[in-house]
């Protein structure tokens, strides 16, 4: 019903429900803290830095207002929130989406007659992903451009014929093919 600021939770749009769902959130760009640790010891001045560039999961919190849902409709919406391993998209962010592991337990509380409010926390991978697919065509030996710093597992299709060795590079890694 309401498309402004809607969320897409595992392919299901909040606007697809027969009652109004208003998403309250400020547009934000999160970056979780690195797992690097400062180790302090009483016998030395300062600290030892134990580097770890990996990042923990992030929490995306949304407050949702549901207006005049029936009990069955509210149960259908709440059933959506038990999903695990799904994509989360926001209408406000046009180019990125998040891979979510799960949703923390939540409840919908009736604040006024017919107005239910739920605070929902999505536990997501710390890297945002692009919504669009990046298609690149290489001729001869070429370099596959990477976007961002996330681990990526691209689908690579090699077409053609070659009597000699062909190679291409992804980031710093060189992939060699004997014959096509």
Language-model regions: role of each:
Residues 23-24, 30, 87-131:
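Short beta-strand and beta-hairpin "edge-sheet" elements
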Residues 130-180:
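Intrinsically disordered, low-complexity segments enriched in serine, threonine, and glycine
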Residues 8, 63-106:
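Short, acidic/charged, Gly/Pro-enriched secondary-structure junctions
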Residues 39-69, 114-127:
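Oligomerization/assembly interface segments of phage tail-like spikes and tubes
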Residues 74-81, 117-118, 135-137:
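"Short basic amphipathic alpha-helical interaction patches in structured regions
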Residues 1-39:
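Polar/acidic, low-complexity leader/linker segments enriched in S/T/G and N/D
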Residues 2-10, 86-88, 165-168:
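Short polybasic amphipathic segments
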């Amino acid at each position: 019903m309401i498309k402004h600021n809607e969320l897409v939770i595992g392919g299901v749009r909040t606007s697809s429900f027969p009652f109004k769902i208003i998403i309250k959130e400020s547009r934000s760009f999160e970056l979780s803290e690195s797992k690097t640790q400062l180790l302090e010891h009483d016998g030395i001045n300062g600290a030892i830095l134990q580097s770890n560039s990996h990042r923990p999961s992030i929490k995306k919190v949304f407050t949702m207002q549901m207006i005049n849902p029936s009990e069955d409709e509210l149960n259908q919406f709440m059933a959506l929130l038990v999903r695990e391993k799904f994509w989360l998209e926001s209408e406000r962010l046009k180019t990125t989406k998040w891979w979510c592991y799960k949703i923390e337990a939540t409840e919908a509380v009736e604040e006024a007659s017919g107005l239910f409010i739920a605070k929902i926390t999505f536990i997501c991978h710390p890297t945002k992903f692009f919504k669009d697919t990046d298609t690149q065509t290489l001729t001869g030996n070429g370099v596959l451009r990477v976007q961002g710093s996330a681990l990526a597992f691209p689908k690579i299709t090699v077409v053609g014929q070659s009597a000699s060795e062909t190679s291409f590079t992804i980031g710093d890694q060189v992939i060699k093919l004997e014959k096509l």
